[in-house]
Amino acid sequence: METQAEQQELETLPTTKMAQTNPTPGSLGPWKITIYDQENFQGKRMEFTSSCPNVSERSFDNVRSLKVESGAWIGYEHTSFCGQQFILERGEYPRWDAWSGSNAYHIERLMSFRPICSANHKESKMTIFEKENFIGRQWEISDDYPSLQAMGWFNNEVGSMKIQSGAWVCYQYPGYRGYQYILECDHHGGDYKHWREWGSHAQTSQIQSIRRIQQ
């Protein structure tokens, strides 16, 4: 049972003017995530059903564990949805390495997060292109690929991508490891014409594994 104070906090969760960051009428939803300021689901806790651009505004100095109860979310290293991205699908994350362990980088900060409104695992489709601006060889994808090269893609880089439906997470290395880039059909109109549009942390066009995001 939630206390009256907790219920009031849930009613005053921060919102954002960005249409892509919060659930919209008719979207799949609902979304629900619970964050904790200590590892192993200890300490202060707070539930969210919409995006949070800065956990420090909710009196959290960091998120050290969390539970995703419904929907899919993106966690960010910094405030305002910037820095490293972490895919957060339904389940429990007792420590930072549960959401960034396969990242291959030691990042213990998670300061903002938002729901992924376009995730649709069964009907996801995207096209990857050899070069920027949708030029060169292309390949349509509608399944999970732990190794693009093993499945026929000719190198370890992708120049640009079009997301026709759903939401995807692309990884720097095979086996879903390395930097994570979450690409959605309702961001940029689904068009990512250059690797710099994959996220504020993007430093390379290297992509070697791709999978659909579970809703």
UniProtKB/Swiss-Prot annotation:
Keyword Repeat among UniProt keywords: yes
Positions carrying N-acetylmethionine: 1
Positions of the UniProt region annotated as Disordered: 1-29
Family, similarity comment: Belongs to the beta/gamma-crystallin family.
Subunit structure: Homo/heterodimer, or complexes of higher-order. The structure of beta-crystallin oligomers seems to be stabilized through interactions between the N-terminal arms. Interacts with CRYBA1.
One protein family per Pfam: Crystall
Modified sites of kind S-methylcysteine: 82, 117, 185
UniProt domain comment: Has a two-domain beta-structure, folded into four very similar Greek key motifs.
Listed GO biological process terms: lens development in camera-type eye; negative regulation of cytokine production; negative regulation of ERK1 and ERK2 cascade; negative regulation of phosphatidylinositol 3-kinase/protein kinase B signal transduction; negative regulation of TOR signaling; phagocytosis; positive regulation of anoikis; regulation of autophagy
UniProt cross-references to SMART domains, sorted A to Z: XTALbg
Source organism per UniProt: Homo sapiens
Domain of life: Eukaryota
Protein name per the record: Beta-crystallin A3
InterPro entries xref list: Beta/Gamma-Crystallin, Beta/gamma_crystallin, G_crystallin-like
Disease cited in the entry: Cataract 10, multiple types: An opacification of the crystalline lens of the eye that frequently results in visual impairment or blindness. Opacities vary in morphology, are often confined to a portion of the lens, and may be static or progressive. CTRCT10 includes congenital zonular with sutural opacities, among others. This is a form of zonular cataract with an erect Y-shaped anterior and an inverted Y-shaped posterior sutural opacities.
Residue numbers spanned by region N-terminal arm: 1-30
The keyword Repeat is annotated on this UniProt entry: yes
PTM (free text): Specific cleavages in the N-terminal arm occur during lens maturation and give rise to several truncated forms. Cleavages do not seem to have adverse effects on solubility. S-methylation and glutathionylation occur in normal young lenses and do not seem to be detrimental.
Function: Crystallins are the dominant structural components of the vertebrate eye lens.
Chain positions covered by the region annotation Connecting peptide: 118-123
Residue intervals of the Beta/gamma crystallin 'Greek key' domain: 31-70, 71-117, 124-165, 166-214
Record field: compositional bias (Low complexity): 1-16
Modified residues annotated as S-glutathionyl cysteine in this record: 82, 117
